[in-house]
Amino acid sequence: MHGFSKAIDIICRYEGYKEKATADPVTGGHPYTFGYGSQFYPDGSPVKAGHHVTKQKALEFLNNEIYVIDTELDKLHLDIDSSMREALISFIHSIGWEAFLYSSVIDYVDASKYHAAVDEMNRWIFDASHK
């Protein structure tokens, strides 16, 4: 795995640390998140209401998620530098892998249309209609 200090910093800053699992603001329930936005434990089991996590464990879970996302990104064979890779990792952590696959971001990045990719990422992050 590459060093992903920027992605970790971005995720930690914007997600914030939550010791106790919180409900999704859109559904009012599932998926629950805790730590720095983790929805799943490293073994794949989901975070549930009432679960708690320490900051240390939350960082371990985040590093595991980043490793998984990075491994999946490798399979797409995108020609991206480390800054774009970290931005994509942060984005994917925020919206999820499935949503990323169905977004236009991959096509824009693959076509080197980076401004369009950023615009699309902003729509997913800040536009409630995508959630």
What are these regions (language model features)?
Residues H77-M84:
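Structural motif
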Residues I92-W97:
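Short alpha-helix boundary/capping elements
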Residues G28-P31, R85:
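A structure-centric signal for secondary-structure junctions around beta-strands
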Residues A87-S90:
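Amphipathic alpha-helical interaction segments
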Residues M1-G29, S38-V47, V53-T71, L78, ...:
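Long, amphipathic alpha-helical surface segments
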